[in-house]
Regions:
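Beta-propeller domains with acidic blade repeats across secreted/periplasmic ectodomains
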Residues: 1-185
Length: 185
């Protein structure tokens, strides 16, 4: 949460740091994108597009004219909720080998929510804990993969295609866990 008297940027920025002189230090900084808030995760898709997760949305950025600035911004998934704690929203982006995007969604403090894909698919809940979802790279075919987490993040696939996630708990509980995620789990 930004303090009331914060004098920095009003929104989050994604920046590119280049070492154009090859001396080991960045000497050129370019703002690739700015405008989101509570930006939680980024991941490059196999085609080079940058997928970004914020507390309440996932969108896809592309630089179509090679100027190191995002000039295309496509919505993928939207979260509708009154929950606003930034660290238990959408996060944990990972791509499988079959053209699907997987992502986590924290327990949202038990507040009701609706997750909406680009094809209108709407999945609703509240109070069941955190979830892992998948959709295609355009935000269609949204589905719940597994449920019952606190705050699943750090999703990754191994070479055999098995999905893993880190699930963190509230600070007063035992440490984070590395979990093997199975469909319907």
């Amino acid at each position: 949460f930004r303090p009331q008297d914060y004098k920095g940027p009003k929104t989050d920025r994604i920046r590119i740091y280049d070492d154009t002189s090859s001396d080991g230090s960045s000497d050129r900084i370019t703002t690739f994108y700015e405008g989101s808030t509570a930006t939680m995760n980024m991941a490059f898709a196999p085609d080079g597009s940058l997928y970004v997760a914020t507390r309440s949305s996932i969108f896809c950025l592309r630089d179509t004219n090679s100027d190191d600035k995002a000039d295309q911004n496509r919505p993928i998934v939207k979260l509708k909720t009154k929950g606003d704690y930034p660290h238990n929203g959408l996060s944990g982006l990972a791509f499988d080998g079959n053209g699907l995007l997987y992502f986590g969604f924290g327990e949202n403090l038990g507040v009701d929510y609706s997750l909406v894909g680009n094809d209108g698919t709407t999945l609703s809940g509240g109070g069941e804990g955190g979830n892992i979802y998948s959709c295609d790279l355009d935000g269609n075919r949204l589905r719940r993969v597994a449920t019952g987490f606190w705050n699943p993040f750090g999703l990754a696939f191994d070479r055999s295609g098995s999905l893993f996630a880190i699930d963190n708990d509230p600070d007063w509980r035992p440490p984070c866990r590395l979990l093997h995620i199975v469909n319907g789990g």
